[in-house]
Amino acid sequence: MLRQIGEFYHQGEKDDTSRVWMTCWHHGGRILASCGDDKAVRVWSLVGEPDSKMRLECRTTLDDSHTRAVRSVAFSNDGKCLVSASFDASVVVYQQEDGEFAEVNKLEGHESEVKCAVFSKSDEFLATCSRDKSVWFWQQDEDEDFSVSSILQPHTQDVKQVAWHPTEDLLVSCSYDSSIRFYRFDGEDWVTQQKIDGCHVGTVWSIAFDTEGHRLVTVGEDHCIQLFVRENIGSKSADQDTWKSVARYDVENTRWPLYSVAWNSTNDVIATGGGDCKIRLFKISSTPESPVIEHLGVVGRHELDVNHVAWNPNPKFSNLLTSASDDGTIRLWELEI
């Protein structure tokens, strides 16, 4: 079901096995960014066509911006910018010019490791989260400079990830405190719209929306995947929307956490990666009123922990998945249905 078509070392050499934390596809599907413990961000090109041998070629290494491991990378929705978040407590924005990315902004203020940074759908806002338990909202002005819009501390522990709704300025965060939080702009400030405690037993490691933004999946330390659905859709005020858990699946025969979850925008397949070095696929079956999370199986492996999985967002390449691992590799997979 998932066929490995390539293995690539983040640092370029087989003997360099520094941990790879994350990969992120450009929205056009032909560019990939990766980051890891080597303090560098690398930009790759996807070479080839779906009916031929495809591979990744490293085109740029950005290694002058951070002094500690780079935990996350994300492209802006217009494709012009790339953002990285680091354990050095900084966030760096790179801008693409003549096909190359160069640093244009360094955002500082978090008190400790920044775990995630991601642009909103409109690219007007940038959200960051940190080990300091805070979620920051940055706003971009006409000169493409960023200023702090709001600082919230809704969690009681390390905030692991933030993710934007695919069509709205709605943000969700997940944390070491076993909870997820939703945020909206109330016209003056960003505010917490909903709190859901006890989502998992232990850390909630990762979150992902479906294409329409009506469903959300989470994975956690308890090796469980959980499905949430949006209620009150179509209400006069979007801030009346609430989310509730409707299904869960507990992965058996493992004691390891699930670290990452990604929802395929074309075929609705969900991928996870975890501490047992395995990649799993899931699908939501049954009716919307009675959904069931179906485990399609273990479909891929690494030598060490799988820290992140990411589907290609371009429909032409939507069957491509990348995985990032402690073993120092980025693996390229093809979904065969």
Curated annotation (Swiss-Prot):
WD repeat residue intervals: 15-54, 65-104, 109-148, 154-193, 199-238, 253-292, 301-337
GO cellular component: cytosolic [4Fe-4S] assembly targeting complex
InterPro entries in the cross-refs: CIAO1/Cia1, G-protein_beta_WD-40_rep, WD40/YVTN_repeat-like_dom_sf, WD40_repeat_CS, WD40_repeat_dom_sf, WD40_rpt
Keywords: Repeat, WD repeat
Keyword ATP-binding: no
Pfam families per record: WD40
A GO BP entry: iron-sulfur cluster assembly
Domain of life: Eukaryota
CDD domains assigned: WD40
Gene3D superfamilies registered for this protein in UniProt: YVTN repeat-like/Quinoprotein amine dehydrogenase
SUPFAM superfamilies: WD40 repeat-like
Family label: Belongs to the WD repeat CIA1 family.
Matches recorded under PANTHER family: CYTOSOLIC IRON-SULFUR PROTEIN ASSEMBLY PROTEIN CIAO1-RELATED, WD40 PROTEIN CIAO1
Function statement: Essential component of the cytosolic iron-sulfur (Fe/S) protein assembly machinery. Required for the maturation of extramitochondrial Fe/S proteins.
Protein name per the record: Probable cytosolic iron-sulfur protein assembly protein CIAO1 homolog
Protein's organism: Caenorhabditis elegans
